[in-house]
Amino acid sequence: MTLQEEILLFSHREIKAKDVFYIKEISKPQAYEFVTKYHYLGDAKFFCEQAFGLFAIHGDQLLGVSTFSQPQGISALKGWFGLTNQDKCVYELSRLCMSPVLNRTNATSFLLGGSIKELKKQGKIRAVITLADSNRHVGSIYQVCNFKYYGLTDSKTDFFSADGKVNPRGSTKEVHGVWLPRTRKHRYAYIIDNHLICKYKEEPKPTIDSTLKLSCCNGTGKVYDNRFDEWYTCPRCNGKLERLEDFGV
């Protein structure tokens, strides 16, 4: 039986994931190469302390990668658990990436669940945290893998200046550009050590109906700087802020 045939049977739930795949720790270069090729963010902000690969039993082909890093942000661990950033007992799931041949299968949950089992065996990590972009999804994969849900991140705004910088230092009073709401993220955590207490309140898990819509431009693709009476392309939706000279508005 070919790998393609096995994946087809697996996608129809006629055989189990453990009959098709196995999981093992992989090197950072292996993870980087795979993630760069298949993840929508490419190699942007790629942080990795440990990585695990999903391999086909027959042929040993790498089909998925999970990467774990130290939580990003100077106060991340303090906010979650009251820990300092010098404490290395908590990981953040930084990437979860699959080959397109596994689209519409539950191989992703098999990889994530198996990766956490491996971390448990190693006995060094007390929890795994992750954030799900609220305008993209609600973190269904984390719910399937028994992560606990701890609500949304706080509401914040970002300043996009006309010269392409985001949140430049200093006063923005005389700087051309726009303030836009930052996408809020769903907080999830898998607590390995039950003695580790999360400071955020556990909440009911969100459903797909609670996916938030970006309020940056309300789908128009343009944003307005009312201080200088200027219109720009929406940097959230278009990837960059560009002045629109002749919008006719």
Q: What are the residue ranges of the model-derived segments?
A:
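Acyl-donor binding region in acyl/amide transferases
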Residues: 22-25, 67-180
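Conserved beta-hairpin
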Residues: 35, 49-73
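Short Cys/His-rich micro-motifs in 6-15 aa windows
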Residues: 237-247
